[in-house]
Amino acid sequence: MASKFFIVHHHFKPGMSGPWWGVMAEADEAAQSAQAEKWMNIGYFNHCFMPLSQEGPMYCVWEAKDGNSEADFQDFIDGPDGANMGMKSLNNNIMKVNLELTGGVPPYERKFA
């Protein structure tokens, strides 16, 4: 089987946008690279991050390696290594992209074979 793609709709819990953006602002290039490598090692890749405003919402497109289920991805994105960064600041609604409707063409080049 092939990897799966998810669109994630992130929206902030009350009063959490400021603290979340504060943590994001502290992440330098080295920290971001380390985080991306950690995600790859556990089978996830963030293809794009699309915030609409500082108060949200935000959208992302993620890829999950074959073997990681939809439930696994929800646990990851809600957990300390996911978008919440350990703060429980976001509600994360995941939507699996139906690649059967695209003729099997993924929205991005696959990172996982």
Question: Which residues does each predicted region cover?
Answer:
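A common structural junction motif
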Residues: 78-89
